[in-house]
């Protein structure tokens, strides 16, 4: 497997719709306001994806138990805003602005941006498997004892694209993966 460079990512986004919408280069200034942004868009060997304006923040209002086999949404409060405050030692879900279509011979890894990591915010996104498509559900943990702010429409994580030496026998689409073509924030289900 080899990591793919900016030229390949650009070509796949522009001719195959691999990333929509696609920012061809790093965007770190808001064109309308001149405000500095946490960067997003095409980089040398990856693509920095953005958070949408929709968030789900864990809360324990109903004294719930988090069980991935029997998950209920009463563990969350839903927020739609340009920012989201994650309580101390808590967790939020969000989704990407970008819609991804992964080629059959590609696997991605997604790594949190250092700007957030240096503030104690850890981003977890599982790999995008061959022929998976959808909006990315993003998990964000606030590991600090303080409330933490995250920003919609700004960078949150970098996607790295790895091309396989050989084609896989069965793709995510062919095995009918449960998160195929997910829209919005998709909570766990078995």
Curated annotation (Swiss-Prot):
Molecular functions per Gene Ontology: dCTP deaminase activity; nucleotide binding
The keyword Hydrolase belongs to this UniProt entry's keyword annotation: yes
GO BP term, example: dUMP biosynthetic process
RNA-binding among keywords: no
Taxonomic superkingdom: Bacteria
Residues forming the catalytic site: 139
UniProt binding sites for dCTP: 113-118, 158, 172, 181-182
Annotated EC: 3.5.4.13
Pathway it works in: Pyrimidine metabolism; dUMP biosynthesis; dUMP from dCTP (dUTP route): step 1/2
Reactions catalysed: dCTP + H2O + H(+) = dUTP + NH4(+)
Alphabetic keyword roster: Hydrolase, Nucleotide metabolism, Nucleotide-binding
Family: Belongs to the dCTP deaminase family.
Matches recorded under PANTHER family: DCTP DEAMINASE
The protein's role, per its UniProt record: Catalyzes the deamination of dCTP to dUTP.
Assembly with partners or alone: Homotrimer.
Full protein name: dCTP deaminase
